[in-house]
């Protein structure tokens, strides 16, 4: 007599531990990591210390997201508007990936996490680009969580870039604006290889999306968490997932 083979879910222990619905884990979670500067100010520390601590939170949340079974985690690391911040702060943020990815890479490889990026990367310093390129190369064959850093990213600029590319293609083919479809725009966005976020989380209590994935979050669930990003932990993420699971997504219907 043959025993029935049951396919085990490697994420089931942590899902069960926190009372999550195993069949309703968001596939794609996007996070606006806000509050690093305020975290540092509360402790009378330089703002850059907040950014450093924020990267430690990235490590923790990436591990939890992977353990839960989230497939895509997109983190808003640096916006196209952030260049207006003080020069020393921008320089520090640009250098963060160099040391951060170097120390984080072994853990990413061990946990089968694949590093990817969206954004206008050509404007980043060469040292930053090299660190990112190495992380992407060393994790390219990983099949687990896709960790997507949005660096020098802006939603309006992304859509504008998409429209310009589509215009050039239409002109070359002798087509008109009547031939433009929603799917065509979607296919020309930086995120074309990923599903739209199911859940968008913003930390620090601010309630705006700050030019982040403005096309892609049309039907995402929004959660505005009061914790500053360096204080955001496993329990907070689990609670956000529970809130997400308590909602009924309608996608414009009833």
UniProtKB/Swiss-Prot annotation:
Its EC number is 2.5.1.-. Substrate binds at residues 35-39, 47, 51, 79-81, 83, 85, 202, 208-210. SUPFAM superfamilies: Undecaprenyl diphosphate synthase. Keywords: Magnesium, Metal-binding, Transferase. CDD domains: Cis_IPPS (cd00475). The active site is at 34, 82 (proton acceptor). Its cofactor is Mg(2+). Pfam families: Prenyltransf (PF01255). Mg(2+) binds at residues 34, 221. One of its GO terms (molecular function) is manganese ion binding. GO terms for biological process: polyprenol biosynthetic process. Binds 2 magnesium ions per subunit. The keyword Metal-binding applies. PANTHER family: DEHYDRODOLICHYL DIPHOSPHATE SYNTHASE 2, DEHYDRODOLICHYL DIPHOSPHATE SYNTHASE FAMILY MEMBER. Belongs to the UPP synthase family. Catalyzes the condensation of isopentenyl diphosphate (IPP) with allylic pyrophosphates generating different type of terpenoids. Homodimer. This is Isoprenyl transferase.
């Amino acid at each position: 007599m043959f025993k029935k083979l049951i396919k085990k879910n490697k994420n089931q222990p942590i899902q069960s531990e926190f009372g999550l619905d195993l069949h309703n884990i968001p596939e794609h979670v996007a996070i606006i990591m806000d509050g690093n500067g305020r975290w540092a100010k509360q402790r009378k520390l330089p703002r850059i210390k907040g950014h450093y601590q924020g990267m430690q939170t990235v490590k923790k949340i990436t591990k939890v997201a992977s353990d839960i079974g989230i497939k895509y985690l997109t983190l808003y690391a640096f916006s196209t508007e952030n260049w207006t911040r003080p020069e020393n702060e921008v320089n520090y943020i640009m250098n963060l990936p160099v040391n951060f990815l170097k120390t984080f890479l072994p853990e990413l490889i061990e946990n089968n996490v694949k590093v990817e990026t969206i954004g206008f990367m050509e404007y980043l310093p060469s040292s930053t680009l090299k660190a990112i390129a190495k992380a992407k190369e060393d994790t390219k064959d990983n099949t687990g969580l896709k960790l997507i850093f949005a660096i020098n990213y802006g939603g309006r600029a992304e859509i504008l870039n998409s429209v310009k590319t589509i215009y050039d293609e239409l002109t070359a083919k002798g087509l008109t604006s009547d031939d433009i479809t929603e799917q065509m725009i979607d296919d020309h966005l930086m995120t074309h290889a990923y599903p739209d976020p199911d859940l968008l989380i913003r930390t620090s209590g601010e309630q705006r999306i700050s030019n982040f994935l403005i096309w892609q979050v049309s039907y995402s669930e929004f959660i505005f968490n009061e914790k500053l990003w360096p204080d955001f932990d496993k329990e907070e993420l689990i609670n956000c997932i529970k809130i997400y699971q308590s909602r009924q997504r309608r996608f414009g219907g009833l």
